[in-house]
């Protein structure tokens, strides 16, 4: 019997979940004969390295149609996305299985100690040290601590590997409309792009972030009356300001009290500042604060999150000279003036490595301000198999608070479990036996496996977030007690198993936990 032609898998979103899923399809000996993945992302192509050869490669392109050119590997670098991501063993394991362990260890930064403090934003107030967890992120099973990456750096690693394996990545491809179409090969989805082009795919994968347009389409298929209400994640009474700063841009006269390699969490009267090391002597910082109301969603462009953050706006020259960090604030759902006012209130907050928050801001090259939302969508809201085959991955399927620490790890898990389900239900043997393409069984089991784990993690993230904010005396007491009771013993000396959810080990051949 003739081997069936590979099914086209259209993946909307080329950040983390999308490229990871594509890598599973491209590397597995069975899946690569059954599926042909194509990544689409609305972001522009990565900035080219300024060489004549790279310019020539980019201008020639490698696509098969107008506006469908793929970016050549090894000749480009991804712009800094302005945020970092952390990976624990459950997120690292699938990537290690894909043969990326050496690259991840080279490009990531392994975290060791975590110091907990209490601080105030008034001038002259010193930090109070609560506890230091020695090698607080250590995994005895992996013999490795948590790894932190700049988000764009991890994306570049994955996308470049996709291209090296002959995969396709289409930049500047904003998906604007989806419709089911019939074909001789079965049910398909036509994806229409803003540039006027379109493509038919056998499986549509939404890996396009918390404000996923693929999810919006899927929810409209389920119930147009409730689609918009179900589409927007729930506001959690919290706002977050994130940045990436450079340790090398600090004043030469400054002597840090604590080492660069140490992660810090400073509890405020309400909220907290968390910082941690990243590759290239960069460090991330997250300022998490309570907020009573979120920005009006209709006043901002709530579309799928771009893989590359927008370019910061430039303030007037006089303001920029007085407060150079203003130029690093990227346009978003909040007015720049609102973000700036919050940051000004925290300038005098002390920090063990930078000295104070103002020094941290001054060395920032990108600052992002966003309301913090969370929702775990139902099983039938993350997959559709009626007149077409659609499935969601990562933040498109479940958006969690940053206090989960697992947004990226769970996205990688999603990609791995979905690939495993395709292998289980879409085998060549089933196709030859006259069965349908197997998408229905694969997508339904994927959703059934993922939702309980997502719900548990979201509940934990919400609880940690509430306690971390310390909005009431009760939560302040819980926060203080939890910090003081944090084990100070070096975890490298303990042979404890990884706790949930870090103990998850997902493989394409099977899924677990």
What do these predicted ranges mean?
Residues 2-10, 106, 127, 405, ...:
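C-terminal helical "tail/cap" subdomain of flavin- and related membrane-associated enzymes
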Residues 3-39, 44:
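N-terminal Rossmann-like FAD-binding beta1-loop-alpha1 element of flavoenzymes
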Residues 11-24, 205-206, 241, 347, ...:
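Conserved mid-domain beta->alpha element of the FAD-binding
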Residues 25-30, 218, 222, 422-426:
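Active-site catalytic pocket residues across diverse enzymes, especially alpha/beta-hydrolases
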Residues 44, 211, 398:
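Short, glycine/acidic-enriched loop or turn micro-motifs at the edges of active sites
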Residues 47-75, 182-186, 225, 297-328, ...:
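Intrinsically disordered, low-complexity domain-flanking/linker segments in eukaryotic proteins
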Residues 48-161, 165, 468:
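Active-site-adjacent segment of FAD-dependent monooxygenases/related oxidoreductases
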Residues 156-365:
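Conserved FAD-binding catalytic core of PHBH/FMO-like flavoproteins
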């Amino acid at each position: 019997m003739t081997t069936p032609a590979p099914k086209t898998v259209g993946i909307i979103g080329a950040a983390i979940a999308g490229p990871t899923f594509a890598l599973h399809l491209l590397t597995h000996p069975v899946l690569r004969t059954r599926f042909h993945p194509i990544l689409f992302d609305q972001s522009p192509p990565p900035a080219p390295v300024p060489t004549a050869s790279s310019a020539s490669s980019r201008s020639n392109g490698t696509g098969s149609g107008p506006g469908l050119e793929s970016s050549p590997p090894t000749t480009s670098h991804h712009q800094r996305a302005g945020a970092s991501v952390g990976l624990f063993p459950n997120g690292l394991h699938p990537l290690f299985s894909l043969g990326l362990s050496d690259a991840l260890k080279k490009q990531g930064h392994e975290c060791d100690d975590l110091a907990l403090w209490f601080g105030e934003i008034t001038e002259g107030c010193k930090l109070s040290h609560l506890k230091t967890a020695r090698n607080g992120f250590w995994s005895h099973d992996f013999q490795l601590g948590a790894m932190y990456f700049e988000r764009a750096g991890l994306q570049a690693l994955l996308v470049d590997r996709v291209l090296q394996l002959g995969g396709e990545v289409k930049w500047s491809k904003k998906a604007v409309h989806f419709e089911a179409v019939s074909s001789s090969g079965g049910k398909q989805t036509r994806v229409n792009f803003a540039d006027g082009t379109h493509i038919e795919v056998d499986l549509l994968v939404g890996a396009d972030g918390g404000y996923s347009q693929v999810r919006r389409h899927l929810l409209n298929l389920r119930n147009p009356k409730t689609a918009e209400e179900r589409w927007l994640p729930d506001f959690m009474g919290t706002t977050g300001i994130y940045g990436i700063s450079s340790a090398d841009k600090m004043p030469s006269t400054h002597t840090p009290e604590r080492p660069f390699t140490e992660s810090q969490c400073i509890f405020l009267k309400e909220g907290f500042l968390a910082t941690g090391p990243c590759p290239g002597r960069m460090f991330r910082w997250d300022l998490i604060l309570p907020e009573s109301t979120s920005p009006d969603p209709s006043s901002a462009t709530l579309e799928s999150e771009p893989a590359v953050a927008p370019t910061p706006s430039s303030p007037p020259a006089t303001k920029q000279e007085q407060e150079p960090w203003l130029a690093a604030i990227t346009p978003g759902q909040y007015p720049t003036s609102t973000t700036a006012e919050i940051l000004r209130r925290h300038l005098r907050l002390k920090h063990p490595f930078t000295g104070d928050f103002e020094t941290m801001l001054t060395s920032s090259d990108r600052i992002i301000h966003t309301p913090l939302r969370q929702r775990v969508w139902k099983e039938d809201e993350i997959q559709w198999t009626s007149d077409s085959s659609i499935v969601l991955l990562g933040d498109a399927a479940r958006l969690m608070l940053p206090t989960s620490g697992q947004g990226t790890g769970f996205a990688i898990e999603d990609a791995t479990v979905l690939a495993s389900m395709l292998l289980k239900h879409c085998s060549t043997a089933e196709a030859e036996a006259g069965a349908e393409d197997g998408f229905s069984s694969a997508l339904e089991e994927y959703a059934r496996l993922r939702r309980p784990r997502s719900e548990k993690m979201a509940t934990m993230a919400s609880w940690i977030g509430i306690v971390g904010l310390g909005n009431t005396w009760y939560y302040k007491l819980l926060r203080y007690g939890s910090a003081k009771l944090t084990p100070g013993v070096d975890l490298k000396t303990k042979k404890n198993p990884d706790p949930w959810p870090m103990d998850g080990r997902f493989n394409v051949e099977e899924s677990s936990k």
